[in-house]
Amino acid sequence: MAYDQLKLQNQLCFRLYTASRLITQTYFPMLEKLGLTYPQYLVLMALWEEDGQKVMELAHRLYLDSNTMTPLVKRMASEGLVTRVKGKLDARETYVYLTDKAKELERQAASIPACMLGKVLSDR
């Protein structure tokens, strides 16, 4: 290769991508026990902080586009995790609210951050 700086392993973006993937994979067993995917967990964390957000606000907050966010929220609604409510003033807006099932998951998920920190620090 003529340009060493173009090697994949020399790219900051690739190293960050790899680290992100490894962290996400570390979450998998804990989230699987709760019946959640990582994107669902992110949505729930945002709603645990502030319930009743617009779909587009959630998308912006989680750095997701609407083509990803809308089906994710629909799937979560079909699984009984959230309810979707059309805006009273603008029917094009959809608000997302936690169900009792999702509120119970918050208690169960409370140990995940400490577990993750322990796993990340011990896997060296």
What residues fall within each predicted segment?
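N-terminal leader segment of winged-helix/HTH proteins
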Residues: 1-34
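Pre-recognition alpha-helix immediately N-terminal to the DNA-recognition helix
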Residues: 22, 26, 42-45, 104
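Short, locally clustered residues in the helix-turn-helix/winged-helix DNA-binding domain
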Residues: 17, 45-49, 110
